[in-house]
From Swiss-Prot:
GO terms for molecular function: secondary active sulfate transmembrane transporter activity; symporter activity. The gene is SULTR3;2. Pfam families: STAS (PF01740), Sulfate_transp (PF00916). It comes from Arabidopsis thaliana. Residues 98-99, 146-154, 198-235, 284-315, 376-390, 433-447 are extracellular. The keyword ATP-binding does not apply. It comes from the Eukaryota. Gene3D superfamilies: STAS domain. This is Sulfate transporter 3.2.
Amino acid sequence: MSSKRASQYHQVEIPPPQPFLKSLKNTLNEILFADDPFRRIRNESKTSKKIELGLRHVFPILEWARGYSLEYLKSDVISGITIASLAIPQGISYAQLANLPPILGLYSSLVPPLVYAIMGSSRDLAVGTVAVASLLTAAMLGKEVNAVVNPKLYLHLAFTATFFAGLMQTCLGLLRLGFVVEILSHAAIVGFMGGAATVVCLQQLKGLLGLHHFTHSTDIVTVLRSIFSQSHMWRWESGVLGCCFLIFLLTTKYISKKRPKLFWISAMSPLVSVIFGTIFLYFLHDQFHGIQFIGELKKGINPPSITHLVFTPPYVMLALKVGIITGVIALAEGIAVGRSFAMYKNYNIDGNKEMIAFGMMNILGSFSSCYLTTGPFSRSAVNYNAGCKTALSNVVMAVAVAVTLLFLTPLFFYTPLVVLSSIIIAAMLGLVDYEAAIHLWKLDKFDFFVCLSAYLGVVFGTIEIGLILSVGISVMRLVLFVGRPKIYVMGNIQNSEIYRNIEHYPQAITRSSLLILHIDGPIYFANSTYLRDRIGRWIDEEEDKLRTSGDISLQYIVLDMSAVGNIDTSGISMLEELNKILGRRELKLVIANPGAEVMKKLSKSTFIESIGKERIYLTVAEAVAACDFMLHTAKPDSPVPEFNNV
């Protein structure tokens, strides 16, 4: 390398200047339209074709309906009926969990699936209510309004919270701000969902033990205290019946997991439990007074509820808070589920379009007596395994639910509440993903800490504390990643021009007169002081080592900036300050491999003038060769004679 001639060094070019508005437009396009959603429309010359493509983009049903076949219809009908058999008992159960009338669970499986079938981009997502959002609704609304004492206000606030959730989801999608939801890391979601599932299971002990009075708190200590303080109120009939159905449900889940072709056994088991539980109690309710049942469910499809929305103080802020928090959680779950099944079938879904679809189905749902819905994993997994081809399976499910609402609701009168509790517990146990937690422990201890913190926050605190911990630790992790970028010493891989981390490649060769440091991240206000201090420490350690070994003293500090995607004014000030500090120590700063954005910023400052263009190189290899040239043929201050432009 040292024999490389000066004329072979390449000068790092400064990117041509761009008008501010054009630069701003490009930046916004990268942030908001990274997937270039209007590419097909932009490349079309005919106005009518552009309108058609635009409508197909907004309403995906127009896209998949064009090639729809009888074979697809057969698959979607089977899938729709299958998920309806799961949606009906789950809907009733989750409405109970949210402290809402059971009929709302059926209402929420009618309108939202129809809206999603028109606007949703996932072929496999099955829309409905979910346990975590139901529990959040109950926990947050229940703090201010008692569902038993003031059921009408509680119901109206649930509709209003659903409206605000839908409005927030729609706005995020329209403004292309989907990345906001991604602030929750995978580890945080695993911990939060696991904690919420644990809390839901604990809450269901009320139904399993036949208790009439129960705590509104969700932390494990208060719940267990409430359970054992009422041990004299436990109903053995309820407990035995609940355990029998729970064992049945878990057995069918185990069979379906071991033999995926028998997925329908697990899918049908909740409905089978409801049917057998209802028949059992219908004939034996006189003998088993301790078993509570649903009672009357009103016949008919969804009544309008737009006039019931509450937009007046003091409750509007409560509904807004509940709507935003539950909406974000539901959105994160729905998009994650949709993407996972899209990956299995090798197609893509548009996250921003999904947000708009979720938002519209919740807005319209709030107008038609529905509470918050999203794409639950259990229902979507059944839909996927049943062989669905398009979102029409949601329409079939909605039709089946409508038939139930119009003609079959009286049949649920004697459905035992303990059966609904068993259905919820069986569904929630699958959300405690211990395998994912073990994987996090093996892969990344910090991610495991994030997961554990979120879990413990929910279980021993409240849902809100768990959510705050999940977001807070995720943000802290993000700040640590960017605010404390890695800096490591690089060495030369023998007989090559490749330079790598010497800790990763111990055989890499270092030079006594050169210290090559790689900065692994952007340089900006949050990390500039840290980088300056850390670089200073590396230099001190290197000089101490050279002093001890008696080698040639340190002459050049080469900063490899290949991973520095951007730099701000604080970062530039740090480089200028570092150059002055090194100058006082008779050391020379050399920059290698700066990116276009970095060079553009540096060219507008005084840094290049102060350091000199002759100390900025295209690659680390050329920077090292130039330093060798100056060390062996000239004084350290001497510039490299010539550069070739690239």
